[in-house]
Amino acid sequence: MLDKLGQNLSEALNKIKNATFVDKKLVKEVIKDIQKALIQSDVNVKLVFNMSKEIERKAIEEAPPKGLSKKEHIVKIVYDELVNLLGETTQKLELDPSKKSVILLIGIQGSGKTTSAAKLARYIQKKGLRPGLIAADVYRPAAYQQLKQLSEKINVPLFGDETRTKTPVEITKEGMEKLKKVDVIIIDTAGRHKEEEGLLAEMREMKDLTNPTEIILVIDGTLGQQAKNQAKAFKESVSEIGSILVTKLDGSAKGGGALSAVAEINAPIKFIGTGEGVDNLEQFDPKKFISRILGMGDLDSLLEKTEDIMDESTEESIDSILKGKFTLIELYAQLETISKMGPMKQILSMIPGMGGNLPKEAAQLTEDKLKRYKIMMDSMTMEEKENPELIKASRLQRIAKGAGVKQEEIKDLLKYYSTTKNAFGNLKRGKMPKMGGQMGQIMRQLMYKD
């Protein structure tokens, strides 16, 4: 898992951060730990050793810039070299809203291409454009049905042939006509092996027909450094590959290897799949990615996620909080918002100091606790939600029984409510809660049992 890589790298860097004195011996020891962490994540050994030499050279020879301590300088060197390993710069998907764009998705069978087509449609939808999908994979029996279910979930038009009697080229040609009103057409092509010349020829025919704005190669993140050969083969067959989307990074022990391998052949990685949900697709930014796995956070992405799930009820709740009203009704709305943002592990990794060494159990406990808190509040009357101070012995007993929990858990919820209310009170008065203060207390109450 990538969180294992992050944990190992963070532990290595902590040796530098916690040291009273940094010498050559410590630098070499930390570099060995970094090498081990990267090789375990299936990063190419040659790449790892070349990077290690650079880290060692800079850490020993370079003087820290003004304003940075020796320890901070070494941590920055490691961070910069890890970013370089993954491609250094961010490559964005450029779409012109004034004209129709066509995206052709290619890749071998089992890479997660069909799911990625829906995720990409959702991503484009959130950017304010109208996407449409074409199911051009007639070789895999469940491909059309899978894309149909996903497209209905995100309310995106789909064209395909459920009978599978038409050729992919015929389906694509008809689909281009039917989806005239959309801004971006995403075509899910048949999964193919890099050696299947017939299918590659068909893909080239579809490329000539659609004149795509971008061809995106979908690669399975569980392949590790083998991803390099796959990307290279497709790039040689279809030289116009515009970018790469790496899937299944949330559950892969070889994710680091896949990313570094693809970056090595100078094929820009534009997207990464970080979960099974249609919203679990992210624009790939090497700097943000490394920041998160090292536990440094990614507040920009966290804010983007928050904006994506903001709805009218959430805005009303925030408006009430800013006016000084914070009851269990507002707390419930906040927990609903957090639940919509995605896996708790992913959210917490975006908060500085909360990623890297975060135990998996803590993230799971947080997610479970959120669900239990909502169940408890569902067992309360409106009067109790508006006036939590009314919840005394008899009411406590009734609510606990209705929610199927112990009375101590209701008390735990009320304690969490009180802490959160105080934090929002400070926010209203212009004091930003710090991770080490009240905000840290809020997160600890959610993450750990008392």
Swiss-Prot record:
Domain notes: Composed of three domains: the N-terminal N domain, which is responsible for interactions with the ribosome, the central G domain, which binds GTP, and the C-terminal M domain, which binds the RNA and the signal sequence of the RNC.
Gene Ontology terms, MF aspect: 7S RNA binding; ATP hydrolysis activity; GTP binding; GTPase activity
Species annotation: Methanococcus maripaludis (strain C7 / ATCC BAA-1331)
Name of the protein in question: Signal recognition particle 54 kDa protein
Binding site for GTP: 107-114, 188-192, 247-250
Catalytic EC class: hydrolase
EC number from the UniProt entry: 3.6.5.4
Keywords in alphabetical order: Cytoplasm, GTP-binding, Hydrolase, Nucleotide-binding, Ribonucleoprotein, RNA-binding, Signal recognition particle
Catalytic activity field: GTP + H2O = GDP + phosphate + H(+)
Task performed by this protein: Involved in targeting and insertion of nascent membrane proteins into the cytoplasmic membrane. Binds to the hydrophobic signal sequence of the ribosome-nascent chain (RNC) as it emerges from the ribosomes. The SRP-RNC complex is then targeted to the cytoplasmic membrane where it interacts with the SRP receptor FtsY.
Gene behind the chain: srp54
PANTHER family: SIGNAL RECOGNITION PARTICLE 54K PROTEIN SRP54 (PTHR11564), SIGNAL RECOGNITION PARTICLE SUBUNIT SRP54 (PTHR11564:SF5)
GO cellular component: signal recognition particle
Subunit structure: Part of the signal recognition particle protein translocation system, which is composed of SRP and FtsY. Archaeal SRP consists of a 7S RNA molecule of 300 nucleotides and two protein subunits: SRP54 and SRP19.
Annotated localization: Cytoplasm
Keyword RNA-binding carried by entry: yes
Any single GO BP term: SRP-dependent cotranslational protein targeting to membrane
Main location: cytoplasm
Family from the record: Belongs to the GTP-binding SRP family. SRP54 subfamily.
